[in-house]
Amino acid sequence: QICRKDCLKSIDFICIDGVKCNKCKRLQYRRCKHRKQEERKMKKFMDEDFLLTSDAAKKLYHDYAENMPIVDYHCHINPQEICEDRKFENITQVWLGGDHYKWRQMRSNGVDEKYITGDATDREKFQKWAETLEKLIGNPLYHWSHLELKRYFGYEGYLNGETAEEVWNLCNEKLAQDDMTVRNIIKKSNVKLICTTDDPIDTLEYHEKLAKDDTFDVKVLPAWRPDKAMNLEKPEYLDYIKKLSEVSGIEVKSFKTLIEALVKRMDYFQERGCSVSDHALEYVMYAPASDEEIEAIY
């Protein structure tokens, strides 16, 4: 940096120690001769203290949180894949098979839908994700993706368009190993409980099977997600209500019977361990109304 009045020589390092130029008295930043050399080294992006920027944070994480079990009360893992202990063929199936957060960023990056949910090959989809990821520095997805690459695949580099082939081959080689099935990945993460995301009409058959499986000691419980029962504006709403009527045994033809059907399904969920709900409400449409008005509207 140089002084605005060209009083100081150009230097290639800035530290927090401010000094004034002897000629123009402007506050400048110059090389600090008293700082230790190791303090001037650039911090690694993904070291053991990633995101831990204070001594207190490091102590709390490494001495306490790091080895504590995970209770995951909201996720999008398919309970069928846990039950059947799925073995993925490639990293695209793991990362892009149903992750709408990644899909959203790819769309924002101008990626054609063919490479997101379309008929492109898994390798092509991964390439487009890698090219998107390099533009997401500062986004949690950038952190999550690189943390996963390091922890589960041993990759400590950067995923981008140029390294996509290398990462693709490395991850797929690891996924071919027997210890990288869905259940084993969950166990490696020290997870003790998982709550999946389930619709009121879901049968929960895989939760029932997992509850009886003595070979897997991680609890897998359902979570109540009734969004489809509330989305009256959706064109598929009436078809959904027919399915709700079938599984509940209550013909939904009024607001009262809708509530009765949902309550019956809530009881069904509760009997299978459900104790949490999950709602994707962008906003709450509220207006005071009597029971008669609600029935007339519905």
What is each residue range found by the language model?
Residues 1-7, 36, 41:
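Short intrinsically disordered, low-complexity coil segments enriched in acidic
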Residues 22, 30-41:
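Short, Lys/Arg-enriched N-terminal segments with co-localized hydrophobic residues
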Residues 3, 7, 15, 21-24, ...:
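Cysteine-centered motifs
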Residues 43-298:
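Metal-cofactor-binding active-site regions of metalloenzymes
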